[in-house]
Amino acid sequence: MEELDALLEELERSTLQDSDEYSNSAPLPLDQSSRKESNLDETSKMLSVQDSTNPFPVQLVYTTNIQDRNVYSEVQEPKKSPPPAKTSAAAQLDELMAHLSEMQAKVSVKADAGKKPVSENLDHKASLDSMLGGLEQELQNLGIPTVPKGHCASCQKPIVGKVIHALGQSWHPEHFICTHCKEEIGSSPFFERSGLAYCPKDYHHLFSPRCAYCAAPILDKVLTAMNQTWHPEHFFCSHCGEVFGTEGFHEKDKKPYCRKDFLAMFSPKCGGCNRPVLENYLSAMNTVWHPECFVCGDCFSSFSTGSFFELEGRPFCELHYHQRRGTLCHGCGQPITGRCISAMGHKFHPEHFVCAFCLTQLSKGVFREQNDKTYCQPCFNKLFSL
């Protein structure tokens, strides 16, 4: 149809040029010629009166009779020139248009009315090709150039009308189509892949990277993380939903988390304060500790010697460990690490289990008690017997 449009345009242009040759010529005034002849007659009469012997030249005198009625020439209204007779190309064009209208009416018939035989369609096609060829020949005979602009890469036929240059080839506009959906691309934008043309929709659907979150094609900016591609607005914390900033992200079980939520959810907790351990830490008692949190559970002093005592899951210094265990010497108040003597509900270093009066060591284990103090028998008798 594009070839037909181009041929019609050339034919119309040639018809307009032919019509311009029939121009309207303005008629001469009615009495212009008669007035000119009368003036010449009068002039010739006056010249004949002159005396050839008179040395003085005779001047011509023109008279005008004002009583005569003024005569004006009348200009006729221009008339349209009759249209030129139709050429054989125009007649053939009319026949072609009628034939096309008939074919279009037949195509619009409902499908359930039955398809026409293939031979009839081929006859119409052959007839149309023949008429197009004849029209092209007539235009050439009229001097109208019909040189093709190349051959269509799809149908391999000459291109006379509109042409599209793409992929290093020439195409009829209706033949330059998307490789996938077969829709006409025409002069619209398209994408090329492996020498084939695709409309933007199909190209993105087939070849654009997919967002790992929404699975939709990524058309603009793409973010690559965790061996996947994402829309920038879809790469956010799996817990709080905030988009990651310059601080980056942490990965756990193939899910991204912001630093705050990752540490709160997955970082080891301090055995003292139960907060996430972020930087320096101590490992003791099968858990981790902030250095400032690993102290005695009673006096909160750090373990400068590097040793501690564990009781009920908490660290203690030696003194408070023995105090809670009840293993402090009742005499000196220091922890008992070796042998001990238990008496009066207390524990003593052997050397500190002595008489409260004479300080004699009660090594034999025989003693007397008075007011929570230990005495040997002689001192007890001396001090408390009547």
Swiss-Prot record:
UniProt GO cellular component terms: cell projection; focal adhesion; nucleus; perinuclear region of cytoplasm; plasma membrane; podosome
Positions of region (Disordered): 12-51
One family name in Pfam for this protein: LIM
Localization, UniProt: Cytoplasm; Cell junction, Focal adhesion; Nucleus; Cytoplasm, Perinuclear region
Keyword annotations from UniProtKB, A to Z: Acetylation, Activator, Cell adhesion, Cell junction, Cell membrane, Cell projection, Cytoplasm, LIM domain, Membrane, Metal-binding, Nucleus, Phosphoprotein, Repeat, Transcription, Transcription regulation, Zinc
Modification type N-acetylmethionine: residues: M1
Biased amino acid composition, Basic and acidic residues: 33-44
GO biological process: endothelial cell migration; negative regulation of B cell receptor signaling pathway; substrate adhesion-dependent cell spreading; transforming growth factor beta receptor signaling pathway
Residues with PTM Phosphoserine: S19, S81
LIM zinc-binding domain: residues covered: 150-209, 210-267, 268-327, 328-386
Keyword Transcription: yes
Short sequence motif named LD motif 1, residue ranges: 3-15
Motif LD motif 2 positions after renumbering to this chain: 70-82
InterPro entries the UniProt entry points to: Tgfb1i1/Leupaxin/TGFB1I1 (IPR017305), Znf_LIM (IPR001781)
UniProt modification remark: Phosphorylated on tyrosine residues. Phosphorylation on Tyr-72 is important for its inhibitory function. Bombesin stimulates phosphorylation on Tyr-22, Tyr-62 and Tyr-72.
Domain notes: The LIM domain 3 is critical for focal adhesion targeting and the suppression of paxillin (PXN) tyrosine phosphorylation. The LIM domain 3 alone or both LIM domains 3 and 4 can mediate interaction with AR.
Subunit-structure text: Interacts with unphosphorylated ITGA4. Interacts with AR and SRF. Interacts with PTK2B/PYK2, PTPN22 and PTPN12. Interacts (via LD motif 3) with LYN and the interaction is induced upon B-cell antigen receptor (BCR) activation. Interacts (via LD motif 3) with PTK2/FAK.
Protein name, as recorded: Leupaxin
Organism expressing this protein natively: Oryctolagus cuniculus (Rabbit)
